């Protein structure tokens, strides 16, 4: 099984529990997480951004297109019952959508899919 290449991952999350969980998981997978609690898409070396679609403070409607314009692969996430938020993420331009449980239990495969799509 090929080893995934380490990436810099922006984590747009204003929920402390989620952000700490994602940081721990990303570090365990060998990636470098950068947590942002405000909508700021600037990071010249980030390859991926994980965006909480349910956070009004992050303004995902503007943030996702800005990340796309910067060439950053955007993974939007919301609860599995929050179908409107997931649809919003699709229309906002998220390249990957995930439920919260997928983000928790399948983060490694989600990031591997990003890497293989960028080859």
Language-model-detected regions and their locations in the chain:
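Short, charged N-terminal beta->alpha structural module
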Residues: 2-34
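Acidic, metal-coordinating helix/loop segments flanking the phosphotransfer/catalytic sites
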Residues: 36-48
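Conserved phosphotransfer microenvironments
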Residues: 50-65
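Short beta-strand elements of ligand-binding domains
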Residues: 73-79
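A charged, well-structured terminal subsegment
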Residues: 108-119
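Output/docking surface of receiver
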Residues: 93-105
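Short, structured coil segments at secondary-structure junctions
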Residues: 29, 70, 92-94
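Alpha4 helix (beta4-alpha4-beta5 surface) of REC/receiver domains from two-component response regulators
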Residues: 81-95
């Amino acid at each position: 099984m090929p080893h995934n290449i380490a990436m810099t991952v922006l984590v747009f999350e204003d929920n402390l529990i989620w952000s700490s969980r994602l940081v721990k998981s990303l570090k365990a997978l060998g990636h470098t997480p950068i947590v942002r609690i405000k909508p700021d898409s600037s990071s010249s070396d980030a390859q991926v951004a994980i965006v909480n679609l349910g956070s009004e403070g992050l303004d995902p409607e503007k943030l996702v297109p800005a990340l796309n314009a910067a060439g950053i692969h955007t993974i939007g996430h919301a609860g599995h019952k929050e179908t409107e938020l997931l649809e919003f993420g699709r229309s906002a331009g998220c390249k990957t959508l995930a439920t919260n449980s997928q983000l928790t239990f399948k983060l490694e495969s989600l990031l591997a899919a990003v890497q293989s799509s960028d080859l």
